[in-house]
């Protein structure tokens, strides 16, 4: 039996941020990642301004990302820039983001083991099986993504109601960076083109109960063909998203952060920012139970509004009218910045 003060399952943005904060405070931290490589995940890899304000002070180099001004099109309307400042998006490969965060966490003193899945979580005994032995924890942090084993062990529902699909096409610089709402085909989901330094992510996201994953893939394939994007030798990537939030702190020293906690916006599908801030503030609450969590609180307030609008847009009777309203707002100069702020600034 191995005893660990803080055991983190999952080495994504949330888990590595938890690890970094706890290790910097002098705590014993072990992170277990089931995948052999840390970082890769189905994700457009977009960092909004608020996300960059989290990562830059941590040491993310200025040349690690590609900066692009984002465009948006509502309901078949033309592509517009809502606000050049607020819609500036930095793109980074998740492999690269994981590499930087791994460096920061290990530099702070955390132990991170990749290729080590965990099983047999026993919340009563505070133990888990990993690497052929039992590990006992004082605090268990589930940062293990949408299909979280820790979330399941807590008995929380895990509907994972959204599905994202993408192709990461190497050597392609397809511009501009854009999001296109296409309510006739993918309901309240959207299509994206996110150029990176070495590739372009072309993808789409939608609720599974309205647009089946197989239908979303066919839609994405059709959009790629329309853009002249070859998919030869480019693997299709798909993943479910958890947007149902039930809390971050639970009895018995168990905590959830990031996708495992369901903090993704069901409107924008933005998840990296929420993973970083919940990871940081879960760690700070472990260190000081009465510590405030202002960034998490603010984000959850934004998420609630996003989720309400997303549910509204899921209704066929109101979808077209609402997207039409957004298209009108996007054509009204003095309304563009407030809309961009609400969607992206949180």
Place the predicted regions along the sequence by residue.
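Glycine-rich FAD pyrophosphate-binding loop
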Residues: 7, 20-43
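Residue-level detector of alpha-helix initiation sites
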Residues: 12-13, 37, 145
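A conserved beta-strand/loop capping segment in the N-terminal third of enzymes
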Residues: 49-100
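Predominantly flavin-linked oxidoreductase catalytic cores and closely associated redox partners
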Residues: 104-230, 246, 262
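FAD/FMN-dependent oxidoreductases across multiple families
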Residues: 120, 210-286
């Amino acid at each position: 039996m191995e005893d660990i003060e803080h055991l983190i399952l999952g080495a994504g943005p949330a888990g590595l941020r938890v690890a970094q904060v706890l290790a910097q405070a002098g705590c014993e931290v072990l992170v277990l990642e089931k995948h052999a490589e840390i970082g890769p995940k189905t994700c457009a890899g977009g960092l909004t301004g608020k996300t960059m304000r989290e990562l830059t002070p941590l040491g993310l180099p200025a040349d690690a990302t590609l900066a692009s001004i984002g465009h948006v099109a509502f309901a078949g309307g033309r592509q517009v820039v809502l606000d050049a400042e607020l819609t500036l998006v930095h793109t980074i490969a998740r492999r690269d983001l994981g590499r930087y965060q791994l460096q920061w966490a290990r530099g702070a003193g955390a132990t991170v083991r990749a290729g080590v899945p965990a099983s047999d979580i026993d919340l009563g005994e505070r133990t888990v099986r990993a690497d052929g032995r039992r590990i006992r924890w004082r605090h268990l942090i589930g940062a293990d993504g949408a299909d979280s084993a820790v979330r399941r062990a807590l008995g929380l529902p895990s509907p994972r109601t959204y599905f994202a699909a993408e192709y990461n096409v190497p050597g392609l610089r397809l511009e501009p960076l854009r999001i296109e709402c296409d309510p006739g085909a993918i309901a309240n989901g959207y299509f994206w083109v996110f150029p990176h330094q070495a590739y372009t992510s072309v993808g789409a996201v939608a609720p599974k109960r309205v647009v089946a994953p197989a239908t979303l893939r066919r839609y994405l394939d059709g959009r790629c063909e329309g853009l002249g994007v070859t998919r030869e030798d480019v693997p299709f990537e798909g993943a479910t998203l958890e947007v149902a939030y039930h809390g971050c702190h639970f009895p018995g020293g168990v905590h959830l952060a990031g996708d495992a906690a369901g903090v993704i916006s069901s409107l924008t599908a933005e998840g990296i920012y929420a993973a970083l801030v919940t990871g940081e503030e879960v760690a700070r609450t472990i260190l000081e139970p009465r510590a405030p969590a202002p960034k998490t609180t603010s984000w959850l307030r934004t998420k609630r509004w996003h989720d309400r609008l997303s549910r509204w847009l899921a209704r066929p009777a109101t979808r077209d009218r609402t997207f039409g309203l957004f298209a009108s707002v996007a054509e009204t100069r003095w309304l563009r910045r407030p809309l961009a702020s609400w969607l992206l600034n949180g």
